[in-house]
Amino acid sequence: MKSEDAEPRKEEKPTQKEETKALREWLVGQQQAIRTAGMPIIVLVEGWAAAGKGSLINELISEIDPRFYNVVSPVITPEADARYPFLYPYAKAIPENGKIMFYDSGWMEDTVRKYLRREITKEQYKARIRSVNEFERQLRDGGYLLLKLFLDIGRGEQRKRMNALRESFETEWRVSADDLWQQREYDAFKETYRGFMEKTGKAIPWHTLDGGDRKEAVHDALQLLVDLLQKAMEKGRYVGKPFQESFPLLHMKKLSEVDLSPALTDEEYKTELKKLQKKLGKLHNVIYRKKIPVILCYEGWDAAGKGGNIRRIAKPLDPRGFDVMPIASPEPHELNRQYLWRFWTRLPRSGHICIFDRTWYGRVMVERLEGFCAENDWKRAYNEINEFERQLTEWGAVVLKFWIHIDQETQLARFNDRQNTPEKQWKLTDEDWRNREKWPLYEAAVDEMLAKTSTKNAPWFIIESNDKKYARIRTLQIVIDALEKACEAH
């Protein structure tokens, strides 16, 4: 019989096991809501070798629909990927809207190991830190949810786990030479890991989990992921505000100030074209041998002559060493990712040339003027593009950007010529005529683009193209001059 004076029974707290089960059930139950909301989620799992990163990811995905997530291990970089920029394997793996991507180690592990092996210098290490902060911030500002976890274990525990793995023929392969090196250099890794997290944890924090207690690590990781998702579902998709970093910008003329009268005779054109193409062909062999990547970006008015200009650049090149990337309206799977993704995935390998016919600058022109992105998005893009191009030039790429320029009268004459010539009619679309009506708006957008994104290392060149022959020769001269300087510097 219960005494009236007895204290009321305290409600028992759920056990860790019960909490973990509830968190997992919530995550499973919200899959469709996350997909419908179009939330792209990245879970980066870093940590010590043998800390249980793979096991943790396996626990996190155990009840999730396999169509809803992917797991990648980009730290194991294939030789082919090693010929791309540092962030390439991570950027190309970002998920589509409404899906989760789990990275089994990533930009932290790759950077720390290369730094401690002295494969990158202190200055390169600093540049990587900056690039990581830019990359993470761009993802966040574009609506991505990013959870960064670090699994921590002590030196003794790591040694114990490695020894256990090495004792069995079935598991010894899981302990690599790099892992054993990390065990020997535990203190150096610990200090460098700490420094990396301090330098990259301000905008998007790191969360350290106790890898010594696997059940607790799973519980805490699920709790952090659920908290992140609940907050996002409550507040809606994050949209970053624009800001402008101080880049070394070059002074650019406004389009209205450009003299479009330069022209060449047929004889001058033929002589120069033959000489310059021969020189470019030889330079292509040198940049291939020296593994210098080259990125040529073409923008310009409709009918300005981009295609013909590109053909004169491409003709003397070895077809095995270059690509031309025509950029049209983004496909659905491209629209479902951060806008730079489709350009990250088209970058050339070192030693190769990539010619972009239209580029990432569509963000601040057609997408801006046609309302395909919000005002904050295109205003933020100037800085994001400068950061992207700085990462390319720090990788070693030669980046040249050409605005192929004509006046309105020349464009109208070329439009009429296309319309009246059957074999050219395919080049002219209704959209070309609509864009022509918006010439003043586009001109203002281009002037702003040139002023805000022509940097010392990735300059813009306005190519006078009322005379196509002159435009082709001038572009060839600029490309050859830049490649000669790059070859001399290597």
Where are the model-predicted features located?
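Glycine-rich phosphate-binding loop of ATP-dependent small-molecule kinases
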Residues: 1-490
